[in-house]
């Protein structure tokens, strides 16, 4: 590699000596590759079109054959062939054929012609070096076979892997579509703090930092929930934020410590309204990004056409395991039944409700392939959700599962400040006992609730997992441009 780099450095110096700057300031484009291909599809084989064009991009392949050369030039939109001949270029042909490598960025001027083999080409009359690449590209036939290198050197992955570029185009389309859908329905996006004095809004371990001037410990937000609810208290009846969330937890194909979510709050709504909103929003985004609501994910057909299945957690667990958790009056009874059913019953699951959630995660969640709203969660694992209107011990909460993954989470929001304080105090006790994911009492949030929050439905959607679905990507790292990686060495 070092020898190749030295050779390319020598070529850069040779360009300078011959009056060519190897790192140009700018280039005047007239066209992009995809537009040229589309607009001139009618050009016949062997014909030329006396239309002057100027294009720029990266040299992906090069073939020099005596007095002729053929390069493939790529820009963001596509590729086009360059037809280069000494008869047209004169002395600059030798310079181009000897000093330009695959990976270099060049600009060319010329006219269009279609080769006898039917390849639309730019017949080059003039060329400029725009950026001399000092590092060779990965092998054009095999690309970046090392998956970890794709994540560490995403810039190379994007250059040589069209599928990766398409993934991030679709991600951008999805984010724009979500914002547009919400904006069109009078939701207002308002930014909330990333640095917070209390880490609340989710059960998660936060990243901790320190403000030197104020001598104050701060947390990177683990959710946007509590500040968005403060905005609802303040009179914003439809509000959302799409942004980054940080959780100091494990890394897997489903988890990255830094990820993106959208949280949405609607006053005078409940979790039933948020279910309707969720399926309409995701179906619309899927239609815009994929052109259909029926897609394939890792070989499995998934139908996102509303309306989606709705079932309670109790119903799904009983259906999968035969266990009726409503019949267990003590934790011990639930543990005995779970062990008889070969289900794990860890000590940390210290209530019947937490054991129900364990049974769900092991026996039900992986099998929820088609979009399914799972309703009515145990109160002890949902400290910010409203008590169920008719089911004691449960809350009005749903999670959306698609292809065995949680994709969204929503509540009828808890607006009773006394109930909320009691729930937060229980969380604080758990934290004092060593639960690093438990939050404390946020006094300012309680005070906001005491001012009065209208009945509200709240929703959070994981953007990365949604994009995984829309791009048929098996790992969250495939849809995050620069995922967190352990330093090499």
UniProtKB/Swiss-Prot annotation:
Bilayer-spanning residue ranges: none
PROSITE patterns linked to this entry: AA_TRNA_LIGASE_II
Chain sites annotated for binding Mg(2+) 2: 406
Enzyme class, broadest EC rank: ligase
Subcellular location(s): the record lists: Cytoplasm
Keyword hit for Acetylation: no
Identify the keywords attached in UniProt to this record, alphabetized: Aminoacyl-tRNA synthetase, ATP-binding, Cytoplasm, Ligase, Magnesium, Metal-binding, Nucleotide-binding, Protein biosynthesis
Q: Provide the assembly information.
A: Homodimer.
User: What cofactor is needed?
Assistant: Mg(2+)
Q: Cofactor note from UniProt?
A: Binds 3 Mg(2+) ions per subunit.
**What species is given as this protein's source?**
Synechococcus sp. (strain CC9311)
Q: Where does Mg(2+) 1 bind?
A: 399, 406
GO terms under cellular component: cytosol
The similarity annotation says: Belongs to the class-II aminoacyl-tRNA synthetase family.
Q: Which reaction does it catalyse?
A: tRNA(Lys) + L-lysine + ATP = L-lysyl-tRNA(Lys) + AMP + diphosphate
The protein in question is named Lysine--tRNA ligase
CDD domains in the record, alphabetically? LysRS_core, LysRS_N
Q: Name one GO biological process term.
A: lysyl-tRNA aminoacylation
**Location, primary (coarse class):** cytoplasm
User: Recorded GO terms, molecular function?
Assistant: ATP binding; lysine-tRNA ligase activity; magnesium ion binding; tRNA binding
Q: What is its EC number?
A: 6.1.1.6
Would the keyword Ligase turn up in this protein's UniProt record? yes
